[in-house]
Amino acid sequence: MKNDVVRWSRQPTSNTTNSSSSSRSDSNSTHKHRSKSNKLNARQLGSNAARSCQQRSSVATTLEDEQQTIIECDIGNFNFDCNLFKTSFLTQHKQKRSGKSSSKSKSNRSRPLAKTKAVFLLALQFSAVVFLCNINVGFVAGSVATAASSAGGSSPAAPSSAPSSPPTVAVPPPPPPSSALKVDPNGQSPVLPPYVLDYETGGKAKLTPNNGKFGQSGSSGSNNNHIVGHYTHTWAVHIPNGDNGMADAVAKDHGFVNLGKIFDDHYHFAHHKVSKRSLSPATHHQTRLDDDDRVHWAKQQRAKSRSKRDFIRMRPSRTSSRAMSMVDAMSFNDSKWPQMWYLNRGGGLDMNVIPAWKMGITGKGVVVTILDDGLESDHPDIQDNYDPKASYDVNSHDDDPMPHYDMTDSNRHGTRCAGEVAATANNSFCAVGIAYGASVGGVRMLDGDVTDAVEARSLSLNPQHIDIYSASWGPDDDGKTVDGPGELASRAFIEGTTKGRGGKGSIFIWASGNGGREQDNCNCDGYTNSIWTLSISSATEEGHVPWYSEKCSSTLATTYSSGGQGEKQVVTTDLHHSCTVSHTGTSASAPLAAGIAALVLQSNQNLTWRDLQHIVVRTAKPANLKDPSWSRNGVGRRVSHSFGYGLMDAAEMVRVARNWKAVPEQQRCEINAPHVDKVIPPRTHITLQLTVNHCRSVNYLEHVQAKITLTSQRRGDIQLFLRSPANTSVTLLTPRIHDNSRSGFNQWPFMSVHTWGESPQGNWQLEIHNEGRYMGHALLREWSLIFYGTTQSIGPNDPISVPKPSGSEATTPNSSSTTSNLHQAYSPQYPRIPPNNFGSSPSGGSKLPLGKVPPPNKSSYVTNNPLLNSAPPKQGYQQISATYGVILGKANGKSNNNSKEKTNNKGNKSNNGNKGKSGGSSGNRKEQTTQSTIIQTSTSKNKYYRISQQQQQKNNKQDRNGVQTQRPKANSGEKSYDEKSRKVVGEITTNSGNGSIKAAKQVKESTTTSSNSRIPKLFERYEKIQAIFPELEPYENSSPKGKPKQAKQGKQFEVDLFKPTNGGNSRQGNTKKSPSVPPPSQTMATLSILPILPAGGSSFLPDQKILKKQQLLMAAAGVMAPAQVEVEMEEVHATPDYEARKDQRKEVNGPNAQITQWDMIFYGTETPAQPDDVANPSQSNQFNLYGNDMAHNDVEYDSTGQWRNMQQVGEVGMTRDHSNTAACLKWSDRKCLGLSLLFFMIMQVFFLNFKHANDNNNKNKNNIIKCIR
């Protein structure tokens, strides 16, 4: 029984049954007698009353004797038949209600009273549960002792709904064993194991009896019907030197069957006498393998939940259009070639594969394997390119990957993906593969129980023959799963990238996921956020973000796929020798990327797996992809959380690959922050800073991982942001409304590729938001940063993001300053969580596997995973590549007054004004200490702050995050602060294009010898930072006569891309600042009207005419000298006598003014003035209910609303979510709690009044009986 409260109750005695039956018959006769006569004599009434009292006491005794054990209280479904507390008033009154409802001789006046009381009690229970849920109190009542019973016996005390028949006590029959529990045929105990919350089960209690998984057979073609988390009859066994027949001997001695080799010295065993689906491990067989000296390690395999990443369309898409198409550019006679818009659309709106084909690049000689549910090898469009050496059936353990056919064709996924890659061209049938000259194979591994051994064996299939592995599946995209590859699959990734393709590394391409509707984040998928895989996202026909797409920082690039209603989909092969035009989801994107990778490998066979990733980053096209989260990283590359670095360009990748030189050896540097144990209260956030100065082996970043150990009352309330030293803002984790797990994260690696090419040296900031409610505290235990990259640059012209800090480096006692390359040991990428989450050893196998260290080569990796022969590092400060001096918001070190170099490390800033501070010393320092600073911003500062408080600081100190600006001491010629002026670049947010641009506030200081009498008095005390136009510097800098004027090295004009976030996020999501660049030239510094532009990046430059008109208006108002209006905006390069003329102009001109406020007023009409006027097409996209999730998806504004209704499933899921965060999302905290308390108090009042009235009725009834007697 699914999602219901399950109870066990013992059988009542025969006397009770007879009493119940007699009560039913007597009650019926009494009812008939009342309907016939209007009078009752005193003797008859007294007899009925005495009998009623006797039977009421008998029923109450029976109810008290029944012992009921609650299996689970499902609060999510609001089932209120569970005893929260056995001695609570709810249970007592419920038993009283049950006893009274079983009475035979109730009067007409007492029946409606009992019904009213039952309604009030039910409302009272509802109020109590809502109150407990709102204050985030979780509980589990009863003990897990047995399994579910039938639906009819789930509520034994439920009153009858029919008013004609009196209620009776329902006694449930004993549940049959088949419906209660799946009993192991080996005679193992049917008692369920305790709840197991670990990453192996996706962070969910898969073994609970109310999840509907037990007892279901499940068809072989439907992966979702399999029992998730159960123990299978297979083992993974490590037998050193097992190839000489020892593995077969071990299997035979212990009754196993050797299914084959997984990879080096690891074998796949099966025992046919063990149940294929068991709730408990087969400890007897596990012990026998552990006691065998020939076996180094063995572990029984458990099933994993893996889903295919496509979806079913409600109706087919529209047909293809030949407008602006390059269909005729290639003479293909395949019937579906005109409809393959993503290959032949032209105009820069396709994958640009036709130019590569014209160069003779078709993927010939490259082998691609599809890891999926099988491959129809005899398909007319696949059989010519089918490669049997690249195929295997892991589910049935044979060489034929043919899929299992069923009524719904559920195993068509692999055949569709294979057709995208290598469908035969010019065969007058179906489609054309993007690499139609490549060889393709298939691995059938999703059509059965998917275990760690099954995944590892699929990923390790013939790595010297197969070049590319394409996978369009992964953990459930339900918005609440956190899962990744197990220990064997992780080892398979490492083996493939280090030894595959003759040492150049196998290429693993993965679909990013289809959990966008559930607001899932692909950084919770351990396959897509792995450094070994190339994660691919999707774009619609119009270049929008699909409604199913997930956003995360690990996505590297994008290919086309399906979109909304009316947009075209992907054409490919299908089961039964057919063709389809409706392949969908990110499942269709990954095979297209695999086909492009095959073209690139044909052009250069010497490319490594890292070379391909570098080529993708350098050639991806951000153009024509619409997403508000586009930003520039520290080296000027555009990157997005939805599209990665952009759309893959096949022809450009082939061109670059032909002349590509192999990248240097990849280095690895890990920095372990000290143990923090930092509590994060609800609705707050903390900022942690980690300064990196010792990772000398990594100067150019590729991948960055943030390993975090964190616990939370609700994992979905956690948000993570990372900011690099080059001010690249990365969103590591977004809120997940369906994730109610309390297991948190245990050393989970959140990966980012957004800092590709930057330098790791400098201050890194990790910002953790807790959007929980009330008592939903979070606790950060530890975190670390892992940098992957190279020591030397890849190209001679690659930009440098952040220069290395100068000065000597000091080391603290609790750290070490060593770096490690890839040949040294490091912690496993995806550690396993023990069942109890307290560090106990995992089940199965007391021995650790023994691995061989691969010989040194490019990209060589050795891990301390149990599968390798290296001891795990000790807990603490192993492999620390930086030193730590823990400070609290203050600079560590003294500044040098002679310094001309400043380091400006800006902290993360939230919407409510919280600012993180980071300090540091500038100039040449004798001693330099790396800082690990924890900054908790719990107070809010007003945006209007006193200027007078900013003027008491010393000269030449760093500007700390734009909050406090230290200005030099006043000279003797300065009278007071009122005679000083400040250059202020304010903070402004403008809507331009698809995103919002926010200029960071900057304060530039200068002094003047005369007072500005026209400045309002208000701005002598306050500055309205966010209301000042950033491009106009209202004050001119005038130097004293006779002193040389130095060019001022002001701060850059920094641009933030503002991305609004859904829910109660108190932080601006995905803010992106421009990189740090060399200071502007003297001409740019002295020209006060021109904005300071960042090198190599675009900036918001106001229109010249607008600025000139503004100057004319200011001159007409008398606030600007007329001579200053003559300054032309085009005058960028100053003449030699420019400074002299400027100083002379300043002496003649009057005092300057400051713009205090500016507004824009629009006058117009809502509709066109004339019926023939063309409507503005952009107005339909101005309002968006989805925030930025669907801001550029035109299906959002479909006139029919049909596809809009399907996309609203995500919002419906929000309303159906019974968690406290989703339930109270529409109301504020106080309103939600207040309404619950008010409802609870009202119910209590009704209950007390009703109880008082009932007591009075009982007293009156007793008085009547006494009078009759």
UniProtKB/Swiss-Prot annotation:
In adults, isoform 1-X is expressed in CNS, fat body and female reproductive tissues, and in embryos, in CNS, tracheal pits, hindgut, posterior spiracles and anal pads. One of its GO terms (cellular component) is trans-Golgi network. The chain crosses the membrane at residues 119-139, 1233-1253. Its cofactor is Ca(2+). CDD domains: Peptidases_S8_Protein_convertases_Kexins_Furin-like. Disulfide bonds join 430-579, 522-552, 669-695. It is a multi-pass membrane protein. Residues 13-28, 150-163, 811-821, 835-851, 905-915, 929-940 have a biased composition (Low complexity). Coiled coil: none annotated. Residues 975-985 have a biased composition (Basic and acidic residues). InterPro entries: Galactose-bd-like_sf, Kexin/furin, P_dom, Peptidase_S8/S53_dom, Peptidase_S8/S53_dom_sf, Peptidase_S8_Asp-AS, Peptidase_S8_His-AS, Peptidase_S8_Ser-AS. It is found in: Golgi apparatus membrane. It catalyses: Release of mature proteins from their proproteins by cleavage of -Arg-Xaa-Yaa-Arg-|-Zaa- bonds, where Xaa can be any amino acid and Yaa is Arg or Lys. Releases albumin, complement component C3 and von Willebrand factor from their respective precursors. Pfam families: P_proprotein, Peptidase_S8, S8_pro-domain. SUPFAM superfamilies: Galactose-binding domain-like, Protease propeptides/inhibitors, Subtilisin-like. Residues 38-57, 858-868, 1005-1014, 1062-1074 have a biased composition (Polar residues). One of its GO terms (molecular function) is serine-type endopeptidase activity. Glycans are attached at residues 15, 18, 28, 108, 333, 426, 606, 727, 814, 857, 897, 908, 994. The active site is at residues 372, 413, 587. Furin is likely to represent the ubiquitous endoprotease activity within constitutive secretory pathways and capable of cleavage at the RX(K/R)R consensus motif. Belongs to the peptidase S8 family. Furin subfamily. This is Furin-like protease 1, isoforms 1/1-X/2. It comes from Drosophila melanogaster.
